[in-house]
């Protein structure tokens, strides 16, 4: 924020680099919270929802591969901490959840309508966007 002194910001950046962080970016608190909602909190929401959507009592563990393991690794979380983080960034988190839901529904609709062309368009779009990261 404008209250921070330049010398203090440089000191924090130096410490972060010394700790091994490679990408340090100065940003506003508002933009930080928007990005954290999308890049950290939404993936945790998805991991919890995916894990909890399984039918209890099945031997799912005998069938999982790397995709499931990768997506659900972060579902093993500190419930007290993450509850506070989600609620503390509620407005931003709900916005990204709504955007995700819209994309999810588009994929679902394409499957329901046997729209192979639309599915492929969505896959191509995501591949191109992922390559830019």
Please provide the spans of the model-predicted regions.
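Internal alpha-helical scaffold of NAD(P)-dependent oxidoreductase catalytic cores
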Residues: 1-74
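Interdomain hinge/lid region at the active-site interface
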Residues: 59-129
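Amphipathic alpha-helical coiled-coil segments
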Residues: 132-133
């Amino acid at each position: 924020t404008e209250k921070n002194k330049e010398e203090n910001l440089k000191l924090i950046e130096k410490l972060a680099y010394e700790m091994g962080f490679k990408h340090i970016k100065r940003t506003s608190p508002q933009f930080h919270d928007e990005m954290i909602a999308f890049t950290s909190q939404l993936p945790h929401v998805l991991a919890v929802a995916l894990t909890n959507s399984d039918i209890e009592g099945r031997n799912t563990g005998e069938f999982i591969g790397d995709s499931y393991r990768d997506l659900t690794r972060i579902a093993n979380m500190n419930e007290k901490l993450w509850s506070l983080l989600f609620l503390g960034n509620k407005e931003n988190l709900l916005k990204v959840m709504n955007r995700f839901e819209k994309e999810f529904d588009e994929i679902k609709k394409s499957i329901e309508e046997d729209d192979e062309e639309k599915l492929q368009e969505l896959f191509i779009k995501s591949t191109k966007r992922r390559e830019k990261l």
